[in-house]
Every structure is written in structure tokens, then in C-alpha cells.
Design a protein with these regions (language model features):
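S-adenosyl-L-methionine-dependent methyltransferase catalytic core, i.e., the SAM/SAH-binding region
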Residues: 2-8, 12, 16-346
Length: 346
């Protein structure tokens, strides 16, 4: 059994960091001079996990199951000096950034490379139940904005989209091998693309001549099949209400490559199985399908007496945060408190 060492209450936080939201994104886009990664709904996360105490007395283990670059976790560790953290992520490249960012808190942090589908066994090996579990779903800006990762429809790169390199199937495999009806279903159900059948038909026609290998070639074909011009600037710079024509198809491909629906279900189940009584689950989603899965899971658990829903409606970013971080516009945070263990105990 494994335990993360308890923090020394007399010592306070290990090397407190001075960064807050304004300077939290030290990483920059390789094709831009601007900052990219700012954790969304950060203040809402701090308040939700800290409860109504309004102080820094939170004590115990929190698991960040989508650690990313460590933005949320760094703020939690700084805000709550007695808190300990288990940070988990499936992307080893992003984990290297998190390790550096969280180094000042090294004695309070353990970092693991794992998927949410591996959480049940990982948490089962701990000798303490977490008091909090945080999910920040979807792709990180540090993944989306690195062309070589293959997530971007604005920058050219290999058509990959794997968050975990242990996976063998890439976006190119799906685009080049799935039949037309399966592609159309994927684009519609996982991406919400209304022109899914037109896009799928265009892909199948085009790949007969040459397989897709690069993101730009696919992005341009999608735009052409939908009859929409491609902008040269980023989505965030587009007119209000406008998105890049390839957005929904790329989202659907990313979700399929990384099996995000199955991973989310596994992560929610692990939270139910291992959170301590009165522990809180915090789930941030950017996709209506993901939010629906979380909502239904918690609603069913609430009917069974497993969860107290602390947010009947999801928390959303305010106008100021959206102005400073446009990606926060679609973020939704749901919070629930664990009432009892699956076996019926309290």
C-alpha cells in the first residue's frame, strides 16, 4: 500500500509559488508569442474543494486525474498548505511539464503516467481514500497548439491525435480505414457535425487517390466539403459565434482515438469506488456529450444515495475570465459530495 507523505503543518507550503492566473502559463505556443495554458474555472475549483470554510485548512489527499501541465494542482497546493496531491495523466510529454511546475511542492506530490481506465487499480493501491478528485476533460491547450501532436486544424502536422503514445491507433488510421457510414456516425455523434455525411463521403472519395497523412490536408478537405472558407487565423480570433469548419470533425476524431467516452466512464466509476465519505468530485467538461455523461452519472448516484449534488446546474466562467481566456467559454464544472461507499457504509 502507498501513502504520500503528510505535509508538515509547521513548515507551511514548500517553496510557495508567486504565480497566479496572470502568469500561470509559462509555456508558449511554438508559433506564437502569446501564453496558452491557463487553468479554467480555477477560483471555482478552489472554492468548491475548500467548501465553506474560507480558509486554508483543507487536509488530505487530492487526485488530479487529468494533471496536464499542473495548473489547477499548483494552485491547490499553494492555497492549501496541508494538502497532498496524486497527479495522473496519460500524456507523458505534458507530465514532464507538470513535474517541473510542481517541483517546489515535491514532498507533497506524486505523479503517475496512467489513463483514467487504470485509476481503479491505482487508487486501490493507496492506503488512504482521497478527499477530492478533479477531472479537467478534453485536450489541453498545450496539446492542441503543438502541430507535431496532430490535434491542430490550423497548423500542419502528422494526423496522430494520441494523448498516450501506448495507443496504437491514430487519427490517420480512422480516416483512412473506417467505412463511410462509420465515419459519418462518428462525426455526427461525437462531434455534432451536421454535415457529417458530406464530410465522410468526401474523405472516402479523396483517400482512394492518396491516404491522409497530414492535418492540413484533412482540414482543407473538410472545409471544401462543407462549402466554408478556411481562415488563416486561430479560432479565438474569429468573429463571434464562428468556429473553424474542421473543429467538430477533429474533435470527433480525437475522442475516438483516445476512447474518451470509455475513459470518462472508467474515471467516474473510480471516483465512486475510492473517494472518501464527504470527498468531492469536480468534473470540468467542454463538450456537451461529456457534460451529459457526468450529469447522468451523478444524478443516478444521487438517487441511490451515493452523491449530494452541490451544483444542480454547472458552474461556468464569468465574462472577465472568458475575455482573458476564450477557451473557458464552453467550460462547465459539476461538483458532487460522496455520501457513502458502494457497499453501503458511511
Amino acid at each position: 500500500m502507498t501513502r504520500i507523505p503528510a505535509a508538515d503543518p509547521a513548515a507551511g507550503p514548500a517553496a510557495p509559488l508567486t504565480f497566479r492566473l496572470s502568469v500561470l502559463s509559462a509555456m508558449t505556443d511554438p508559433t506564437s508569442d502569446g501564453p496558452v495554458h491557463v487553468p479554467v474555472l480555477a477560483q471555482e475549483v478552489l472554492r468548491s474543494l475548500g467548501g465553506e470554510r474560507g480558509d486554508n485548512s483543507l487536509d488530505g489527499l487530492v487526485v488530479d486525474v487529468t494533471l496536464g501541465a499542473g495548473g489547477h494542482s499548483a494552485l491547490l497546493l499553494e492555497r492549501f498548505p496541508r494538502l497532498r496531491l496524486l497527479g495522473v495523466d496519460q500524456d507523458p510529454e505534458i507530465l514532464s511539464i507538470a513535474r517541473e511546475r510542481l517541483e517546489p511542492f515535491h514532498d507533497r506530490v506524486r505523479i503517475e503516467h496512467a489513463r483514467m481506465s487504470e485509476l481503479d487499480s491505482l487508487l486501490g493501491a493507496l492506503d488512504e481514500a482521497p478527499i477530492g478528485l478533479l477531472m479537467d476533460l478534453g485536450a489541453s491547450s498545450l496539446q492542441l497548439d503543438r502541430p507535431e501532436r496532430g490535434f491542430s486544424f490550423t497548423w500542419d502536422g502528422p494526423l496522430d491525435m494520441r494523448m498516450d503514445p501506448r495507443r496504437t491507433r491514430t487519427a490517420a488510421d480512422i480516416v483512412n480505414r473506417w467505412d463511410e457510414s462509420d465515419l459519418a456516425d462518428l462525426f455526427f455523434h461525437e462531434g455534432g457535425e451536421r454535415g457529417a455525411r458530406r464530410v465522410a463521403r468526401a474523405i472516402v472519395d479523396s483517400r482512394r487517390r492518396a491516404p491522409f497523412r497530414r492535418t492540413r490536408a484533412l482540414s482543407e478537405l473538410i472545409a471544401l466539403s462543407l462549402g466554408r472558407p478556411i481562415r488563416s487565423r486561430r479560432t479565438e480570433s474569429a468573429p463571434r459565434g464562428s468556429i473553424h469548419p474542421a473543429t467538430r470533425v477533429f474533435q470527433a476524431l480525437r475522442r475516438a482515438v483516445n476512447e474518451e467516452a470509455d475513459e470518462l466512464e472508467a474515471g467516474l466509476t473510480a471516483a465512486r469506488n475510492h473517494l472518501a465519505p464527504d470527498g468531492r468530485l469536480l468534473a470540468i467538461s467542454f463538450h456537451s456529450g461529456e457534460d451529459g455523461v457526468v450529469k447522468r452519472f451523478l444524478a443516478e448516484g444521487a438517487r441511490e444515495g451515493e452523491w449530494d449534488l452541490e451544483t444542480r446546474r454547472p458552474l461556468e466562467a464569468g465574462p472577465e475570465e472568458v475575455r482573458s481566456n476564450p477557451r473557458a467559454r464552453s467550460a462547465k464544472l459539476r461538483v458532487a459530495r460522496r455520501l457513502r461507499t458502494p457497499g453501503g457504509g458511511v
